[in-house]
């Protein structure tokens, strides 16, 4: 293991323009994460988190077709995690990155204090938002290398507005993105793909957001939430893999700022046979610590992070063992697997980072 870690570090430091971890994140953040990973591996820690998924509320100002997070009565939608509960979750978990999701986090009146507290702890914060409130609330935050606004855009204007079931949202989000970038904020795009999208459409979208000047783009097929309002919009796993192969073919030489590890992109293209690592992205919300992951909402909750790790029957979950997981390729489950693979096989990860995913030939077994 020590040999692999040394190789991993050498690959990272000797080739900063083709990073092992990803292309859409500053080197300082990558090195912080790499050091954290090395500490866990050298310490013999079996299960450790990479990203804390913090959901301080479920209330949202949109009702998206593919969302399974807002199907609750008002008494639940009106609940909030306090500043203290949010910071305690970060302390319990210890992950170097915190993704604040929801619901719409900017509806939380005390969110600026949550963000300040996380940054004071040295956490890299991704504040997820549909951007409808971003222009109004932007001055509540200060530009920082530790803060990124992660704006939800599921494609170009017509596609995104249809996805969120409201006209005009795309244009308002783009205006907010441009304003945030002009003020010096880090901005990321979070894009989910659904049925009916062509490779050409997605490539055009990625070209557009690159021109906007965003730092990175996270992209994945939509997870088939049981509570989503529409159930016919999700993509089967094999179709997702072929879609990504075709997208990546169109992206040759374009240097899209995809905010993913090289091996996760290779997985999306059907070249890696991965099982998910749900404890890599644990979720804390108003109910507690969600079992087993951010996406499955009916599996129960733990009172503490320690209880989540020790009492969750992890063997019950995965694409090969649980029908609910059958078509999942979400980065919240598989990015941690890809990063762990890169730690053990740094030369393979480096090769894929240099050459890109294989886009033809047989796919890995599912």
Predicted regions and their residues:
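Short, P/G- and charge-enriched loop/turn segments at secondary-structure junctions
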Residues: 39-43, 267-271, 314
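The −1 position to Zn-ligating cysteines in a subset of zinc-ribbon hairpins
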Residues: 59, 63, 275, 324-327
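Flexible mid-to-C-terminal extensions adjoining Fe-S/redox cofactors in radical SAM and related proteins
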Residues: 4-5, 10, 48, 290-366
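Conserved alpha-helical substructure of the radical SAM core
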Residues: 3, 7-140, 145, 341, ...
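Short, charged, surface-exposed secondary-structure boundary motifs
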Residues: 137, 159-162
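Radical SAM enzyme [4Fe-4S]-AdoMet core and its adjacent flexible, acidic
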Residues: 1-18, 23, 81-82, 121, ...
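Conserved residues at the C-terminal ends of beta-strands
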Residues: 70, 101, 152, 220, ...
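Cys/His-rich zinc-coordinating "finger/knuckle" motifs
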Residues: 66-67, 71-74, 283, 300, ...
